[in-house]
Curated annotation (Swiss-Prot):
Residues 27-40 have a biased composition (Low complexity). GO terms for molecular function: identical protein binding; phosphatidylinositol binding. InterPro entries: PX_dom (IPR001683), PX_dom_sf (IPR036871), SNX16_PX (IPR037911), SortingNexin/PXDomain-PKLike (IPR051837). Residues 1-66, 81-107 are annotated as: Disordered. A 1,2-diacyl-sn-glycero-3-phospho-(1D-myo-inositol-3-phosphate) binds at R144, T146, R184. Residues 1-10 have a biased composition (Pro residues). Its main location: membrane. Residues 105-218 form the PX domain. Belongs to the sorting nexin family. Pfam families: PX. The modification Phosphoserine is found at S222. This is Sorting nexin-16.
């Protein structure tokens, strides 16, 4: 019995060619480097990433495609504050040629903020990396250890003379142990520092794609970027509330200190006022005492004068009484002398 022939529709014409076109995908929240690899392991990992949104840019062959006019929203960190920038320019106009980038335009050392174990379909760990292109502009990207490993392989091919230290893989033990993940995070941070320390490596295309330097991700490019944007806002809000609480406590302590100082000032003013009144009272007392002393002294002088007068009077009376007997004695003596002379 013959099997009936069932025609199978096949794409023809331009649709077939567009179906097989290799589209260059932009680095999204994570797995951007993984998507450029054709290894079976990379395909298996990328297939297990769940329903994470992947964004792409138009390829160079499709020049007639319309440019999306939706605004580009970027998260910016200015010092300790954050802001959102809305730009209506197409992203193609913002892309820069890596060959024309100067050494001074290289970004600062990316900082790994932490890691997260994802359990959508397959369990894996992603690392949250903060990239600062300029002090005013920064963004967050998510990368897996596989992305770091493939970037390291590319850099070995491009720069054979450089050997970048990448934390080794772990085959037999638990890859989700907290201590192990923290040690790996430190190793990946050292790997990123070595990337930025070399001029040629920091400006190569592989590193720029890895860090999304030419096309920074927006907060709504994927679910992970949106969540990272919300987490950034939450962290900023928490930090500002904490600073506000600390400032309020500091203000309360300063108010208390001010009241204590004011009380101390009032006490000192009262003491000064009291001390300023005491000399007047002492002067009054001294004046009265002086008058009394003068009166006493004057009375004492009067008494002394009276005593002296009495003494002088007493001295004068004996002198007068004794003067008469002296005259009498002299008269007697003269008389006696005269009498004796007559007898002779």
């Amino acid at each position: 019995m013959a099997t009936p022939y069932v025609p199978v529709p096949m794409p023809i014409g331009n649709s077939a060619s567009s179906f097989t076109t290799n589209r260059n995908q932009r680095s999204s929240s994570f797995g951007s480097v993984s998507t450029s690899s054709n290894s079976s392991k990379g395909q298996l990992e990328d297939s297990n990433m769940g329903n994470f949104k992947q964004t792409s840019v138009p390829d160079q062959m499709d020049n007639t495609s319309s440019v999306c006019s939706s605004p580009l929203i970027r998260t910016k960190f200015t010092g300790t504050a954050s802001s959102i920038e809305y730009s209506t320019r197409p992203r193609d106009t913002e892309e820069q040629n890596p060959e024309t980038v100067n050494w001074e335009d290289r970004p600062s050392t990316p900082t790994i903020l932490g890691y997260e174990v994802m359990e959508e379909r397959a369990k894996f760990t992603v690392y949250k990396i903060l990239v600062k292109k300029t002090p005013e502009e920064s963004w967050v990207v998510f990368r897996r250890y596989t992305d770091f490993s493939r970037l390291n392989d590319k850099l070995k091919e491009m720069f054979p003379g450089f050997r970048l230290a990448l934390p080794p893989k772990r085959w037999f033990k638990d890859n989700y142990n907290a201590d192990f993940l923290e040690d790996r995070q430190l190793g990946l941070q050292a790997f990123l520092q070595n990337l930025v320390a070399h001029k040629d490596i920091a400006n190569c295309l592989a590193v720029r794609e890895f860090l999304c330097l030419d096309d920074p991700p927006g907060p709504f490019d994927s679910l992970e970027e949106s969540r990272a944007f919300c987490e950034t806002l939450e962290e900023t809000n928490y930090r500002l509330q904490k600073e506000l609480l600390e400032k309020q406590k500091e203000m309360e302590s300063l108010k208390k200190l001010l009241s204590e100082k004011q009380l101390h000032i009032d006490t000192l003013e009262n003491r000064i006022r009291t001390l300023s009144l005491e000399p007047e009272e002492s002067l009054d007392v001294s004046e009265t005492e002086g008058e009394q002393i003068l009166k006493v002294e004057s009375s004492a002088l009067e008494v002394d004068q009276d005593v002296l007068d009495e003494e002088s009077r007493a001295d004068n009376k004996p002198c007068l009484s004794f003067s008469e007997p002296e005259n009498a004695v002299s008269e007697i003596e003269v008389a006696e002398v005269a009498y004796d002379a007559e007898e002779d």
